[in-house]
């Protein structure tokens, strides 16, 4: 068996999951950065209690759940129907399904292979490194003898970028904007200052896409969303960019592969009240045929 596991932070499937998500996320040493495990757990508890009600209210506006799990499951189902060389499944870091239960579903031996595929096109210790460490620890804990391969960044991949360009232009045909905003999930500047490659990868990716789209837009803007707390984060903020727009725009969520609360609620709903001009949101790759095609080609090229 060649088991491909997509890795993501996960999205709450109900309002009760919001507390689970926050508690696990802020207890991740790559997120909070407090080395002492007991102190980190205590601080995570305080932050969770302070934020959970607001998160639940946001989720109510999305129908009470994130679309991330269902879209990822749909992507796995589509890929499993298209071929029989790989078996596709997914693991979340902060809400179910967790690594323990997913790995226990399969009987694996030394002739099998596990391919860990974080659904993040750009590298960050807060996403890719954290995901891979948790999975590799669980594989070791369960004494699984299968060979393990890992996928890292894929933002430079030609097929992946052709898909993005296609999705952007398809939306532009329906909403003719001259400004394209690339919105990436922000990170604290302190993480970047320690050598995290995320900002560099995102900027490189924007340059690749600008070159492919230069004949279709007059202006390209890279902005960062989802800032949290009083510390310095990557700038400019997407909300500030929208508040100062002088013409309508399209937004592409460049750091996301699957739609989640940050895209559906934050970009699609919350920022609408802040925007000076009208804008439209382009969906993530999600379970599209083009994304499935990219994944299969990418995996076949690994061999």
UniProtKB/Swiss-Prot annotation:
InterPro entries in UniProt: Ferrochelatase, Ferrochelatase_AS, Ferrochelatase_C, Ferrochelatase_N
Family, as annotated: Belongs to the ferrochelatase family.
CDD domains associated with the record: Ferrochelatase_C, Ferrochelatase_N
Any Gene Ontology biological process: heme biosynthetic process
Entry keyword Iron: yes
Localisation: Cytoplasm
Keyword tags: Cytoplasm, Heme biosynthesis, Iron, Lyase, Metal-binding, Porphyrin biosynthesis
Chain's role: Catalyzes the ferrous insertion into protoporphyrin IX.
Domain of life: Bacteria
Reactions that this protein is recorded to catalyse: heme b + 2 H(+) = protoporphyrin IX + Fe(2+)
Amino-acid positions noted as binding Fe cation in the UniProt annotation, renumbered to this chain: 185, 262
Gene3D superfamilies reported for this sequence: 3.40.50.1400
Name of the protein in question: Ferrochelatase
